């Protein structure tokens, strides 16, 4: 079994606690994968800071291609946060546009989701902005 947790890019306390619990599981040998908290991970600097936050291993990125149906489901799921979306997406492009833009950037022109595996005993190569390869 694999455990999925937020990378805690947006510094929300609940995400930070989930990240800490996931790291503890990884230290016990449980495979752990972290997802990028959208929309906070859209900021390359915030993402690099989250990845630089101490962890007992290295980060290995992997991209998962998204079909148009999966991208649409992601937008629908984000739209369910009715109390948060008016605050989060009040400036700039709307939520749908930001989701698509981010997915295309992550997938280098094709919609994708980026996940981060925590690999105990490995060091993370130097990360750089803005692409966060």
Question: For each predicted feature, which ranges?
Answer:
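The feature marks non-catalytic terminal segments
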Residues: 28-133
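Charged helix-capping and loop-helix junction motifs
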Residues: 16-23
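Surface-exposed cleft-lining segments at the edges of enzyme active sites
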Residues: 5-11, 61
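Active-site environment of divalent metal-dependent phosphoester hydrolases
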Residues: 10-13, 42
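Structural motif
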Residues: 1-2
